[in-house]
Amino acid sequence: MEKNSNKELFKELKETKHRLKIAGFTISIMFGIVIVPMFMNLKPSYLELIIPSLIGILGPIYLWVEKKQLNHSIKGIINLLDEDSGLLRQLKEEMQEKQANLKRANRECDTSFFTRKITEYKKRIAANEYWRTKFQRLL
């Protein structure tokens, strides 16, 4: 289930990034349509000049903000994928602490629960590493 959600999220982010590129290209063309007649002394009306100019000026600013937000979201996803590494470290520390406490009490140490959990986390970390590299390519 987690694999499918990562796949869908990756696909959605990739499509969004592609749409932002297309929008930037479109805005550049619209801005060019206004600038070229100005240099050719065709003297377009003010309305024909102002609206595309505003789009040409404000459009890239809007796209820049959207791209920054998208990159911030991708970095957040990468950080979430990295959290499992921290959980694994925490689990290993808990296991070592429990082993030390049991040894102090001269009891046998049963670490099968921790071993099972550590194996589970290692599998998740391996899967997350794959998705982490895919999401990093979007940045």
What would you call each of these model-derived segments?
Residues 19-39, 56-57:
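Canonical alpha-helical transmembrane segments of integral membrane proteins
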Residues 61-78:
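Transmembrane-cytosolic junction motif
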Residues 79-139:
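Charged, low-complexity cytosol-facing tails and large interhelical loops of integral membrane proteins
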Residues 12-15, 50, 65, 69, ...:
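N-terminal Sec-dependent export signals
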Residues 1-7, 98:
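Long, non-membrane, amphipathic alpha-helices that form coiled-coils
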